[in-house]
Amino acid sequence: MSNTDDGFDKEAAREELREKYNADQQDREETARMSDLLLQGATMTNDHCDRCGTPLFRHDGETFCPTCQHDDNDDEPTATTQSAPDRSPPADPQATPHSSPPTTPDTSSSTAAATDDVPTAAARDRPEHAPTAEPTTPATEELESTIAALARRASDADDPRTAREYLEAAHEAAAALDTLRP
């Protein structure tokens, strides 16, 4: 019997499993980063990143997204710089992103170094969905956060029907967001 006789494509199923494994691997890496931050003394806040839906962390008075911050090392901007305009500038302007770890145990080189990159990366590369002149309101920020969370839940859903429901809800939230923006 060939793959087309019974309507089941083994290669497509394998590819789907590969994609799911890669997504699971990324989730494990994100979880490991968050665990490391907690062990280093960072605090997980009740807020979530507008871009990826990951919980925001606070360390040394700065709030950041561990996932987007990690992506910043790949020259991608974060949404947290736009959702927190009252953030103070980095405490140590001399720090570089690839510096060696400090000798004091109470500071985190990955947290401090990547946080120093945030304003530079955000100024250099703005995401398409975040215009520079538009002020954000709590309603738009909440809708953006909800859209990101719904999209993440849809990608994590095992049941296609559940994923479709999450995506429909995200679509409705996006339509509401479009009506709020001028």
Swiss-Prot record:
Region ranges (Disordered): 1-162
Low complexity: bias regions: 105-122
Coiled coil: none
Compositional bias annotation for Basic and acidic residues: 7-33, 47-62, 153-162
Record-stated family: Belongs to the UPF0148 family.
Name of the molecule in the record: UPF0148 protein VNG_2366C
